[in-house]
Amino acid sequence: NIVALSEVRDIIGRMTAFVDQVYIPDTLAIASFYKDWFARGEGLGNFMTFGDFPSDGSANPAKRLLPAGVILNRDLSHVEPVDLNDSAQVQEFISHSWYDYSGGKAKGLHPYEGETTFAYDGPKPPYDQLNVDKGYSWLKSPRWRGKPVEVGPLARVLMLYASGHRETKDLADYALKKLDLPIAAMFSTLGRTAARTLET
């Protein structure tokens, strides 16, 4: 009904105003005081997205707002194609996770064949430190053709940037210019925070 749709429109408007007037300015302000964190926490430099948000309602991967692909070694000038239906391309590993696979922790599984069997063997809280030689996370570790890859907000923003998505490039370039930083600063702890902000 029209009243419910009007309420939804108002909620979306308030959320948009909050992001534009609070979230983005706060992220830029805080980041300007902690710019050294743009040089910390860099991962492996490999990023993967599965693709999402069909722009025309079809299942055609080429029509997705967020393309599927892999960026290797921080090279934003080249995006590798990814085939989610190829079990040799994409696998999830749990060797350092609090899960177990029926075939053991050493073997990766394709997400379509994945298992989520809880196997917490970590310390009993409270604890001071985790043993990183064993399980220490509830996350699975994705691999593309055997290479570890990062997924999530930073991967999505970088994939859009590398694919030439105009709005993403404009937003990222604007934020980096305000902070007087190169695109390479995104490969960091604060870069991940900035990616969450830009994605919102």
Language model: regions and residue ranges:
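Active-site bordering "gate/hinge" segments
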Residues: 1-199
